[in-house]
């Protein structure tokens, strides 16, 4: 980027002194908002076309400005554009380059427009596109998770289900995958809902109060792919709730991906041994030759924190800004850019990694059988015989204590020990003690029984289309 050369500012008419160099450095946003160059030029092309349609500019002026903008865009795409710090931001850089290329007629581009509505429309365009792109990437991961659920349902792979990270009850591995499918479906929906709400163009709001020029805001909104213009000019230039909603959706998705990351990290440890992550998505140690580190999942878990921080940062920025535009709002973009970039790569990595992850069914089944995971099934067995569930719970709790003190599992207890705990317990309860029967018994809607999981997969497959 070219440093300041103290050219005359496009807004410099009322100023008698040049901008202080440190102020210029502090004030400039072109280092990051140049990312909006494509959106900025699209907005300008729509604006100048509308100015011609309503008779504010001649057709020759429209053509000259439009061709000039096209040439500037070509330079940007080619990487030959000279971004200058003294021109502050993407808008002034583009307009100054246009002026250098086509002369004073470039100044007519800004008729009936302010940088306030210009940046608002640029940022909305970017954020709307980012929301829809993350929705698509979330959908792709959802499809991968669904395929994994289908694969593991066919083999009826059993996994221990946990509460408090203690073995709770056996579940199907497919049921575990479907839990994340459900989360990702809501995540995708949040991005699409946010994109629909931000589908309004602030272009034409001007500085804050609208403009006396006879512009057609509906025309520019349509040209830019928006459903409608914003209904209030103050709101159009002064609100950033669309960015907050986007960041909120990012934060919730990040929380889900962080939970997934934590489970994959734990399940891949030597102590658990439930799965093996692919070599392509793990790393080694500089000193310990045996190490295979889950860096992708660890970074995905950690990066959730920066996404949360981006949301909190923007909330803190906007909470004290009066209507309408304030320079504070320059701080709205980097967090959105960063969250979008972060989630884009995490979603892609998991979409690649999960199908290559190997689950060890014999290990997960053995783990599911430990920790007295079928104790609730024994209590249910008694309850079906008419024993009040709380009494059954007390009886089985005593059996668990007996087995635990003697280093045994429930199925190791003798018939006499079972009947001593309750006369309705005996050899026939053994069937309730298997993890397979425990899983099959959970037939309630949304449960882990194979038939219920199969239904959930079918519904999820239909929802994906």
Swiss-Prot record:
The UniProt entry, under NCBIfam families, shows:
argH (TIGR00838)
Similarity section: Belongs to the lyase 1 family. Argininosuccinate lyase subfamily.
Q: Where in the cell is it found?
A: Cytoplasm
What PANTHER family does the record point to? ARGININOSUCCINATE LYASE
Q: What is its main location?
A: cytoplasm
Q: Reaction catalysed? A: 2-(N(omega)-L-arginino)succinate = fumarate + L-arginine
In Gene Ontology terms, what is one molecular function of this protein? Answer: argininosuccinate lyase activity
State any GO CC term.
Answer: cytosol
Give the EC number(s) under which this enzyme is classified. Answer: 4.3.2.1
Q: What class of enzyme is it?
A: lyase
Q: Which UniProt keywords apply?
A: Amino-acid biosynthesis, Arginine biosynthesis, Cytoplasm, Lyase
Asked if the record carries the keyword Cytoplasm, the reply is: yes
Biological process (GO) annotations held by this record are:
arginine biosynthetic process via ornithine; L-arginine biosynthetic process
Q: What is this protein called?
A: Argininosuccinate lyase
Q: In which pathway does it act?
A: Amino-acid biosynthesis; L-arginine biosynthesis; L-arginine from L-ornithine and carbamoyl phosphate: step 3/3
Source species:
Deinococcus deserti (strain DSM 17065 / CIP 109153 / LMG 22923 / VCD115)
């Amino acid at each position: 980027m070219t440093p300041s050369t103290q050219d005359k500012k496009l807004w410099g008419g009322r100023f008698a002194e040049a901008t202080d160099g440190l102020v210029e450095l502090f004030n400039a946003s072109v280092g990051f908002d140049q990312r909006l160059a494509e959106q900025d030029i699209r907005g300008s092309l729509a604006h100048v076309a509308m100015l011609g349609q309503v008779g504010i500019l001649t057709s020759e002026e429209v053509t000259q400005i439009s061709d000039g903008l096209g040439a500037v865009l070509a330079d940007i795409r080619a990487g030959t554009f000279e971004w200058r710090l003294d021109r502050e931001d993407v808008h002034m850089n583009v307009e100054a380059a246009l002026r250098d290329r086509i002369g004073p007629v470039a100044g007519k581009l800004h008729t009936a427009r302010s940088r306030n509505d210009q940046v608002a429309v640029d940022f909305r365009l970017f954020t709307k596109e980012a929301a829809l792109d993350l929705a698509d990437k979330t959908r792709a991961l959802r499809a991968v998770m669904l395929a994994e659920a289908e694969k593991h349902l066919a083999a009826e792979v059993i996994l221990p289900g946990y509460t408090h990270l203690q073995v709770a009850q056996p579940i199907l591995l497919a049921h575990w995958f479907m839990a994340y499918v459900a989360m990702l479906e809501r995540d995708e929906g949040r991005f699409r809902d946010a994109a629909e709400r931000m589908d309004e163009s602030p272009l034409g709001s001007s500085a804050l109060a609208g403009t006396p020029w006879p512009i057609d805001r509906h025309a520019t909104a349509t040209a830019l792919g928006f459903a409608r213009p914003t209904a209030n000019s103050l709101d159009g230039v002064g609100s950033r709730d669309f960015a907050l909603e986007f960041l909120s959706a990012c934060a919730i998705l990040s929380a889900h991906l962080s939970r997934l990351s934590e489970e994959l990290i734990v399940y891949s440890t030597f102590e658990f041994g439930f799965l093996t992550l692919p070599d392509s998505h793990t790393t080694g140690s500089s000193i310990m030759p045996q190490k295979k580190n889950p860096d992708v999942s660890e970074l995905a878990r950690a990066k959730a924190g920066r996404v949360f921080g981006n949301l909190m940062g923007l909330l803190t920025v906007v909470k004290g800004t009066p209507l309408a535009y304030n320079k504070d709002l320059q701080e709205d973009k980097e967090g959105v850019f960063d969250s979008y970039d972060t989630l884009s790569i995490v979603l892609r990595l998991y979409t690649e990694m999960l199908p290559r992850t190997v689950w060890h069914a014999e290990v997960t089944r053995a783990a599911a059988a430990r920790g007295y995971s079928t104790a609730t099934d024994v209590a249910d067995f008694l309850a079906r015989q008419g024993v009040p569930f709380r009494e059954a719970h007390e009886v089985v709790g005593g059996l668990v204590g007996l087995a635990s003190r003697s280093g045994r599992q429930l199925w190791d207890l003798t018939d006499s020990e079972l009947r001593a705990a309750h006369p309705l317990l005996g050899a026939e309860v053994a069937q309730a003690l298997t993890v397979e029967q425990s899983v099959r018994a959970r037939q309630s809607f949304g449960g882990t029984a194979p038939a219920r999981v199969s239904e959930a997969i079918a519904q999820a497959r239909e929802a994906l289309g």
